[in-house]
């Protein structure tokens, strides 16, 4: 006779996601619908303030909300601490992150550590952190991924998103397409290490990747509908992590390679770009159709080669052979020992990434 079932887990999901043309003024209604009162802290940068921040601030001020603002730099533990200090001094009851990955991650982690709600207002789609429960923060010079909470709400204005350089939107596409290898790694860890696996989270993650792959040829620069087609899968990808209770649905060996490159060749390429190229190679290791990913990335304008990434062959070989050490607890196709330099070089040649 089987034992009594006692498994339980809480899932945090965004309460409201609003995306589309000209939705920024809906921030006041969103905050009101959430029942948020008191003072809000807006985290932005000088560029993102002009893109969307001023509209957010004016709309909330006109609606009677008291606001404090913090013009933050890069996402570091220091800027997160400063955001917390400002929020505590102002007795802020909610935070709003306006920007790309860094400003959203600063506000996200600060809100998590203060146990207050957070609203995400993206100004570009460079990666899938818009709605995820993870924050990527530089800690003592090293890039780390921190547990956080999903945003209470997401407000994504496509009229703003399409103004970002196309490189950022293409990088967001690459980050989501890389979910294909993340899921393969997760399934492998489930089979070999008995790691918990969520079919629903995996399905959402794969669905978001497929949405980009199947629409790649229709995604065009300066076409607002393209921002609409990109931001939806990016948000779904983030939500899949919330359902899984971990970043597993969207972070596998390709992300380990990206994090290794952050240390070996910092600032050379965007996170999503590195993940996209990593996914080409990892799909080949899995024995899958890596050329399908390659075609998609090429079509949307994301890098597919070392030259396009600005990474040398030696740097990528180093990343491939050391990536397994980035998160020893995260089992992937790279295994416990990693791959040999000769195998890494062969992989680069076989996939055409070395071109």
Where are these regions (language model features)?
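ATP/NTP phosphate-donor binding region
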Residues: 1-94
